[in-house]
Amino acid sequence: VSGLKTVIPSTPYDAKGLLIAAIEDNDPVIFFEPKRIYNGPFDGHHDRPVKPWKAHPLGEVEPGHYTVPFGKAVIHREGSAVTVLAYGTMVHVCEAAAEESGVDAEVIDLRTLLPLDLETIVESVRKTGRCVVVHEATLTSGFGAELAALVQAECFYHLEAPVTRICGWDTPYPYVHEWSYFPGPARIAAALTGIMEA
């Protein structure tokens, strides 16, 4: 749909700022709320309690009016070895995976899928030479395919390894086996380690 903007926040601060921006925007906006992060920044470890938002630097929501601009990604974790592109819940899972793997990964929170901050993505991938795209949707027809294609087109001569996608499996969502379907920190850490060896 022409003009449709797509928003997926990963923090309470961004959720408020992006929602106000969506309300004030003249075009239609689809606003996704990742339920897994309602109680705190879920890091993908379903067997541990979630740390509350009050312990997170972006958990506090400023009183009053403010907006977060569409099409402006934010780097949640600086790094120089590999660029990780994520949104929503996956931002926190990727941060945990980077810490656990010991890979110097730069984790970028896209915040909005349309418009997309291609400038931040390209700058990071040209710096690191590697890119891992992570999302919860299926591998086939997921937004990660578009991200991988854009990175390939814009950064081809800077890539030291193929773009890697870590996503849900190409199956209907299996509620009984949710945690084997969900791209958890172990799968992401393995991808980070693997792309460094490529």
Give the positions of each predicted feature.
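Conserved thiamine diphosphate
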Residues: 1-25, 168, 191, 196
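Thiamine diphosphate
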Residues: 35-198
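Residue-level detector of structured alpha->beta connecting loops
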Residues: 3, 26-27, 102, 129
